[in-house]
Amino acid sequence: MFKFQKEQEIANIAGIKVGGQPGELPTVLAGTIFYNRHEIVEDAAKGLFDRDAAEKLVNLQESGSDTTGNPHMVHIFGTTAESITRYIDFIAEVSDSPFLIDSPEGPVRAHAAGYVSEIGLADRAVYNSINMSINTSEMKALEQSDIDSSIILGFNAKDSSLQGRMEMLETGAGLLEEGLLSIADRCGIVNKLIDPSITPMGNGAGIALRMTIAAKAKWGHPTGSGIHNAPSAWNWLNRQKEKDPVLYKICDIGSTCLQQAAAGDFILYGPIEYAEYVFPMAAMSDIMIAEAVADLDIEPVERHPINFLV
């Protein structure tokens, strides 16, 4: 293992700390709820869902966090302004944790930013994400909101190399007038969480691991990803899924360890149902990493799996 020469930022999001040197803080884990075709969702457009089942899933994640010491956030996914509003209200009611607001639609993300500001929850919200598709209206909505935490996505549709992704953050890579980090500054983002972006296996998925290290070395911001998207988009693995669902689940969940070993600070681990497996696995990695850097003058915080489970 290693220690970064660059001072590493530690972001504080509603009491949850993320970032720092490898082995210093436990990995922050975020499970996704209300995702596409989630069985608990009854009407994705209106945001109708089985409330009892949803609360059990949130509690499952919180239980994993209580057991291992790994902090957690709830990754909310919505496709319409109506649905994401209902989802935010529900998560705020049943949990005190920070939450990510995510949608494939920019106007929906912008609406969510305004809504959490209106109801006084902006300090708990993480915008997901500032990316190369951001336009003027979305920037304006984010700038006018009270949100100060956001994921900055390093996806570059023209150049998925390490250089292309880094340039997207720093300069806009010739596709934007300025880099995404600069845009984040203009939008009032203090807590910048860098996500290198996960492309399919065979199309540069592993570059995200290298970029995690490169980004932390260059800027010092907390960095992580939704690395499970690599195995979940793996054609070979998907062909095995019907024959052996356990094999699929092992690869999907196991990818968590790869991101942690590459100095990841946070992980969007996919379906929140996987919490009962992800938290012990992430805790195991955190313990081993903390032990690996013990002689590098890196001391784990009190609330760390090494102090909970060893």
UniProtKB/Swiss-Prot annotation:
Its EC number is 2.1.1.-. InterPro entries: Dihydropteroate_synth-like_sf, MeTrfase_MtrH/MtxH, MtrH. Signal peptide: none annotated. Keywords: Methyltransferase, Transferase. It is an enzyme of class 2 (transferase). Pfam families: MtrH. GO terms for molecular function: methyltransferase activity. GO terms for biological process: methylation; one-carbon metabolic process. May be part of a complex composed of 3 subunits; MtxA, MtxH and MtxX. Belongs to the MtrH family. NCBIfam families: mtrH. This is Putative methyltransferase mtx subunit H.
